[in-house]
């Protein structure tokens, strides 16, 4: 006899427990980012703004980038979960892989923000790969939810295509920065991350028109 997969509707406690755990993990990852700000000599660092910038300037930039990345993932995840009518074990499992990638971000951020290794490509590559994994897994959560009919209203083909392409844009940009870190420099690779801003704006405008065209067909 075929066993029916476990599925919990929004009004069940198991749904709240699953989402509550995921939200708490996002919050923990954001909180742990503060541990990436490390001052070796507080007396010298707080002697002037210039000294403070020398001590934690690069770490603060890495902190800001990682905070924005994690917060953006949580906002996207929050919007996605708002459309869930139920959740099942498969979707919970994919979400656990997602939060595994999220909780690694404080570590990868610390490696990028460490002044002692700023000229080495590996720290930048580690963070880039971390974001690629997080972006891919977040998109996978959406795809799994669509395939298992967990969303209401059910998205059309245009909306599905737009969401998947938009979700994988971060993975593409950060993935492209990996060879740049080795072939040019870590700084050049990190600068390419900024290109995600105009790319996201373009996808937002073009994708909306494309989505309406496909759904109307």
Task: Describe each PLM feature range.
Residues 1-217:
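Multi-pass alpha-helical transmembrane bundle typical of ion/small-solute transporters
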């Amino acid at each position: 006899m075929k066993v029916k997969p476990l599925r919990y509707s929004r009004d069940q406690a198991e749904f709240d427990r699953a989402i509550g755990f995921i939200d708490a993990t996002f919050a923990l990852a954001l909180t742990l980012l503060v541990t990436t700000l490390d001052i070796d000599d507080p007396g010298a660092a707080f002697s002037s703004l210039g000294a403070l910038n020398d001590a934690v300037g690069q770490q603060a930039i890495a902190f800001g980038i990682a905070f924005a990345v994690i917060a953006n993932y949580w906002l996207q995840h929050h919007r996605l979960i708002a459309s869930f009518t139920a959740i099942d074990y498969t979707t919970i499992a994919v979400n656990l892989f997602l939060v595994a990638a999220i909780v690694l971000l404080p570590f990868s951020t610390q490696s990028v923000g460490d002044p002692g290794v700023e000229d080495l490509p590996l720290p930048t590559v580690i963070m880039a790969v971390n974001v690629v994994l997080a972006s891919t897994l977040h998109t996978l959560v959406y795809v799994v939810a669509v395939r298992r009919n967990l969303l209401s209203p059910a998205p059309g083909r245009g909306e599905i295509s737009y969401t998947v392409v938009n979700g994988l844009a971060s993975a593409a940009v950060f993935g492209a920065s990996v060879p740049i870190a080795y072939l040019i420099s870590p700084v050049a690779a990190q600068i390419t991350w900024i290109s995600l801003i105009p790319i996201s704006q373009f996808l937002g405008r073009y994708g909306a028109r494309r989505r309406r065209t496909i759904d109307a067909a």
